[in-house]
């Protein structure tokens, strides 16, 4: 084989080795409906195996944002893939769909097989938690576009739901109970602000031991985004949900209204759930208001469910049976707008 391409910065052999290394991780995500294996021109999935009468496909794509820079700094790459999966499948399940399969896109400055394997391992871990198959992807070595130790990671997921069961939020009404599911921390949003406040301005490092966190700052920041697929599917199967919102960039103020029909709003009871200490640390070091925090971060709640009053106890029991802590954090109100009671300006 000619060395011309390698001399230009693209190592084909390293790419082949990376693919071979990732195969075992891909294989453990296999599920019913997947046709064929890794290496084809596209991934195939047989929808007829789901037994849906009027299937609706629900798709989502997302990335990990500048949380990747924390992974670069820590030289730890085996969990960032779960973040990519979580950001996609959580967006799908809030629409009532079961995630079926996932594809990843990884662009890097230099193909290092061990690093690529670690990244894909994290993707496969996320797929296993979500119950979806990793059926394909693209790994692109792009010298000159990225530095040798840099990469970007994005994901694409597709799910399916019976048309009649599509969760649109149109049936949410005043009086519905808002149930919050705890986050695992920052998840994958707000990291540009986090880096400025904690690393740049406060002078902390990823090795800083934070007593309030009980771990190093790096360990806290790289905690993977939580995947909520299985507990939500359990609630959906019983018809318990009127709506659901994945709390990502924009926090409570931007994400909860996305599930609401016109004519209603929400009132959140601040203090009705425990807020992880990472948010207090960011507030203290950055001099941020509570309004700033709720406009930017998930504040310890990664998923908000709207549940009819007469079903909320059953929903809480179902969530608990599926390993989820859950908190009643507020109500749907008859007046449009988002009110978080008890926070300062």
Swiss-Prot record:
Its EC number is 6.3.3.1. GO terms for biological process: 'de novo' IMP biosynthetic process; adenine biosynthetic process. Belongs to the AIR synthase family. This is Phosphoribosylformylglycinamidine cyclo-ligase. It is an enzyme of class 6 (ligase). NCBIfam families: purM. InterPro entries: PurM-like_C_dom, PurM-like_C_sf, PurM-like_N, PurM-like_N_sf, PurM_cligase. One of its GO terms (cellular component) is cytosol. PANTHER family: TRIFUNCTIONAL PURINE BIOSYNTHETIC PROTEIN ADENOSINE-3, TRIFUNCTIONAL PURINE BIOSYNTHETIC PROTEIN ADENOSINE-3-RELATED. The lineage of its organism: Bacteria, Bacillati, Bacillota, Bacilli, Bacillales. One of its GO terms (molecular function) is ATP binding. Pathway: Purine metabolism; IMP biosynthesis via de novo pathway; 5-amino-1-(5-phospho-D-ribosyl)imidazole from N(2)-formyl-N(1)-(5-phospho-D-ribosyl)glycinamide: step 2/2.
